[in-house]
Amino acid sequence: MNEQQRLASQQANSSKKKEEKDYSKYFESVYQPPSLKEAKKRGKEEVKIERDFGLPEEFRNFGTGRKFYIRTYGCQMNEHDTEVMAGIFTALGYEPTFSTEEADVVLLNTCAIRENAENKVFGELGHLKALKRRNPDLLIGVCGCMSQEESVVNKIMQKNQHVDMVFGTHNIHRLPYILKDAMFSKETVVEVWSKEGDVIENLPKVRRGDIKAWVNIMYGCDKFCTYCIVPYTRGKERSRRPEDIIQEIRHLAANGYKEITLLGQNVNAYGKDFEDIEYGLGDLMDELRKVDIARIRFTTSHPRDFDDHLIEVLGKGGNLVEHIHLPVQSGSTEMLKIMARKYSREHYLELVRKIKEAIPNAVLTTDIIVGFPNETDEQFEETMSLYREVGFDTAFTFIYSPREGTPAAKMKDNVPMEVKKERLQRLNALVNKLAIEKNNRYKGQIVEVLVDGESKNNPEVLAGYTRTNKLVNFVAPKSLIGQLVKVKVTDAKTWSLNGELVEEPIEVE
């Protein structure tokens, strides 16, 4: 670690952000701004599991004759939260619409992980202001991760007074009450809980499709990487009980779903909060191997918690797919230390070795940040060399974006933007080079494809994904949508494969 990095790290841990005048009177008394000091205070209170969600009689037909619209930003967790909110709206009697002009309620389900995502939300709120003028009865709401940031709520209260309601990630189940309050209140209704929520089971859902489904296995994150806002916006780690997860997946399988993605901010930490049983992600995956469903995958994993038992179970195959998304963020041990990732370059490479030994055909993908405070040219080159050594199939790459309230935001962001862009360009060139090399190896191979639907670029072509998450385009009857088929790969591109159908749907044993 060089001297600049050591000083920056010390400053991040010691400096305190000045409190600004805000609108905290609008918050419930339990709300606290997202600061490292407060957010690290993980309470020892037992997480309650509520299994009796239901709508009181006062909400029956509450939304009859009304329509709702939800715009979702961010990760799969947000997408799944939107499915839950759509389920609650539908239970209230609302109908969905794809037009804000037709909607009686517009919700923006937001993402806080990068500044660009927040800018998009405030831009959309600006567009909705004109719609509110034309339709004063329209209810506009902001929910999701941005709502957990007090500075964001302050900005909404100051500059976006046409917003009727703001609520966070921990109280989605209270949507009916929030809607009712917003409908009859002259002021913006703000219901944001800093205290992490309980685990609410049996919430209604309107799933996006009938082929693949997302299933939450846990909520929150306790890792506190210095650049990441998620531990503040999603709260402490809380795991669902295994019996509830297995029951939900069995129900989805019985209803014809072919693929399940297990969701969590850090799925590898699943079960670490259980006090009555020793049960982790490896144990859950071992039980899910016995469920009659074609594919099980998970996201997102943290290298720190990726244990040998999980690797052993994944090596058994079956319905457990060979694709693993394993964010590394940097190839430099010094940068990883400043990021508080709690593993080294050597640890990561050893983990990759174990995975490839247990699962010889494993496909690995990753996330990488460039331009983190004080990142040197040499440290960036370590990231490039690690990428080559692992041989990732692809990566999500990002320029570092400071998030207010995180330790990294207190570090001096002293890597010039032109340097950040140049590094990102070089990294992306490497990502693209390896991606086409990896895809070229599929030429002539026959792969199993789960058919999602029509190609976005050509309705005469079908598109689907392999077990290793490769997009495959091919011509076939639309009756095969939702089926598992065999496709011979005839051509490879950087981000997709082309092929020919070689046989009828596969029977899943």
UniProtKB/Swiss-Prot annotation:
Its EC number is 2.8.4.3. Binds 2 [4Fe-4S] clusters. One cluster is coordinated with 3 cysteines and an exchangeable S-adenosyl-L-methionine. The keyword Plastid does not apply. GO terms for molecular function: 4 iron, 4 sulfur cluster binding; metal ion binding; N6-isopentenyladenosine methylthiotransferase activity. The keyword Phosphoprotein does not apply. Keywords: 4Fe-4S, Cytoplasm, Iron, Iron-sulfur, Metal-binding, S-adenosyl-L-methionine, Transferase, tRNA processing. Its cofactor is [4Fe-4S] cluster. Residues 1-13 have a biased composition (Polar residues). InterPro entries: Elp3/MiaA/NifB-like_rSAM, Methylthiotransferase, Methylthiotransferase_CS, Methylthiotransferase_N, Methylthiotransferase_N_sf, MiaB_methiolase, rSAM, rSAM_horseshoe. Residues 207-437 form the Radical SAM core domain. Residues 16-25 have a biased composition (Basic and acidic residues). It holds the Pfam family Radical_SAM. It comes from the Bacteria. One of its GO terms (cellular component) is cytosol. NCBIfam families: miaB-methiolase, MiaB/RimO family radical SAM methylthiotransferase. Catalyzes the methylthiolation of N6-(dimethylallyl)adenosine (i(6)A), leading to the formation of 2-methylthio-N6-(dimethylallyl)adenosine (ms(2)i(6)A) at position 37 in tRNAs that read codons beginning with uridine. PANTHER family: CDK5 REGULATORY SUBUNIT-ASSOCIATED PROTEIN 1, MITOCHONDRIAL TRNA METHYLTHIOTRANSFERASE CDK5RAP1. This is tRNA-2-methylthio-N(6)-dimethylallyladenosine synthase. The lineage of its organism: Bacteria, Bacillati, Bacillota, Bacilli, Bacillales.
